[in-house]
């Protein structure tokens, strides 16, 4: 697509989405069409390329896409909380400037073209989770521990970026995201947070606006890590010129669950006298590496695993600290002994204050939709293949190599290519299409 034409269409789409998102209720298709038509007319005078366009065709395509998104539904998450939880946000939010949250919301609507229901669910859920945390500006000290549970690949990262944005607006000043145990996952999470929260990418000593930063850089957080590197002694030296006590903007760390990385963060925060700054610690995949694997019921005061102890020490550095774990498999987390409280490490990471479950959207395609559940099994989406036994026997050695592809697999590949082509023609190229072929346990 011509760059000018693409810009013209994006202006129409973004402006229409902004208006429709701010209207109350679910719009009728006729109202959606009128809105898109009005913005087409408004921008046509600015873009000469419009003279070469078919207005009806462009408006129809945009309206079809937007209305298809309106069919996606998502319920509000469900919360379990302790008796000491006291809602605080309703009373405080009139004094909060939602700069980071509004910027992130605008990014989801305009740039990511998220369905209205998906954006509204992140809006509501992130607000509810923040309300379960403590008011960072309240007098005195607090420590809160919570857990957010969601299905695999259902939007956990997008949700905690929304929570981080809201928390930064509310007054949390130190934000740490522990993103897995491998560099690949940490780098991916860093990139997502740059797009959705910081708005810039530091690479090769240059600062490039990305994501939310392309729309507004009136304010920006202090990025303590980059896509190139985890927190290190070199990065700590570079941050000497600015301390958390010298700015009202939040500091963001995206680190691996690695004892060396965590120790360097702990030492830098301890040296920077940050103990009075409110801390939000996000533990992504909270059931991985964070659990104290050395725990024994008969020895509750035993030495914890290295990473578990460091996470607890990190929380203990601050007078105001909130730990929020995110996971799709919470079994280990809810089985943590809630009574553990050692002199050296403090309480363990049991989510003693709240658990919040994120609901799946109606278009989420997961294991339950494929297989059903125990009471209502389903094979609606399964196709049983019976032409592959001669090509790839069920029992085979790891060295086995098939001599040809089954006709069913060839048909499936052709179908995937055709379906992807149709989707591209209808909606453009901003969609991922994936096909996984896994016919042997040795090739997973």
Question: For the regions a protein language model found, what residue spans apply to each?
Answer:
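Low-complexity, highly charged intrinsically disordered N-terminal segments
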Residues: 20-141, 183, 187-248, 254-276, ...
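P-loop (Walker A) phosphate-binding loop of NTP-binding proteins
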Residues: 151-152, 180, 440
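Short helix/loop capping segments that flank catalytic or ligand/cofactor-binding pockets
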Residues: 157-161, 186-187, 262-264, 290-291, ...
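Walker A/P-loop
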Residues: 142-160
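Pre-Walker A (Motif I) flank of P-loop NTPase domains
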Residues: 141-148, 173-174, 249-251, 431-435
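Conserved SF1/SF2 helicase motif Ia
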Residues: 167-185
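Conserved P-loop NTPase catalytic core
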Residues: 204-211, 277-283, 287, 293-426, ...
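Walker A/P-loop NTP-binding motif
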Residues: 157-171, 192
């Amino acid at each position: 697509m011509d760059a000018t034409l693409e810009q013209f269409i994006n202006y129409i789409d973004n402006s229409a989405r902004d208006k429709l998102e701010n209207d109350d209720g679910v719009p009728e298709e006729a109202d959606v069409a009128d809105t898109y038509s009005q913005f087409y007319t408004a921008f046509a005078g600015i873009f000469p390329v419009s003279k070469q366009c078919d207005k009806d065709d462009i408006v129809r395509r945009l309206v079809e896409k937007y209305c298809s998104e309106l069919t996606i539904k998502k319920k509000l998450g469900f919360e379990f909380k302790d008796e000491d939880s006291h809602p605080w946000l309703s009373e405080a939010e009139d004094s909060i400037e939602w700069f980071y949250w509004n910027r992130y919301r605008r990014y989801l609507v305009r740039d990511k073209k998220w369905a209205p229901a998906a954006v509204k669910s992140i809006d509501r859920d992130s607000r509810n989770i923040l309300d379960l945390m403590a008011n960072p500006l309240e007098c005195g000290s607090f420590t809160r521990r919570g857990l957010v549970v969601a299905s695999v690949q259902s939007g956990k990262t997008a949700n905690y970026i929304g929570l981080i944005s809201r928390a930064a607006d509310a007054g949390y000043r130190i934000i740490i995201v522990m993103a897995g145990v491998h560099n690949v996952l940490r780098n991916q999470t860093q990139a997502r947070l740059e797009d959705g929260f910081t708005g810039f990418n530091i690479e090769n000593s240059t600062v490039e606006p990305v994501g939310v930063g392309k729309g507004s850089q009136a304010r920006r957080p202090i990025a303590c890590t980059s896509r190139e590197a985890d927190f290190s002694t070199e990065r700590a030296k570079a941050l000497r010129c600015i301390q958390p006590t010298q700015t009202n903007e939040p500091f963001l760390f995206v680190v691996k669950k690695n004892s060396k990385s965590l120790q360097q963060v702990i030492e830098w925060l301890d040296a920077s006298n940050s103990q009075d700054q409110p801390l939000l610690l996000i533990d992504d995949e909270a059931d991985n590496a964070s659990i104290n694997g050395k725990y024994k019921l008969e020895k509750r005061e035993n030495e914890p695993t290295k990473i578990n102890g460091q996470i607890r020490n990190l929380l203990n550095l601050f007078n105001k600290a909130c730990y929020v774990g995110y996971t799709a498999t919470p079994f280990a987390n809810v089985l943590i002994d809630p009574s553990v409280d050692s002199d050296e490490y403090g309480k363990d990471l049991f989510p003693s204050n709240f658990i919040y479950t994120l609901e799946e959207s109606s278009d989420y395609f997961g294991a339950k939709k494929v297989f059903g559940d125990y009471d209502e099994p389903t094979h609606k989406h399964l196709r049983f293949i019976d032409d592959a036994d001669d090509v790839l026997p069920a029992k085979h050695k790891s060295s086995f190599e098939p001599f040809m592809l089954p006709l069913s697999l060839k048909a499936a590949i052709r179908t995937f290519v055709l379906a992807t082509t149709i989707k591209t023609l209808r909606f453009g190229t901003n969609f991922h299409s994936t096909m996984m072929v896994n016919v042997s346990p040795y090739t997973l």
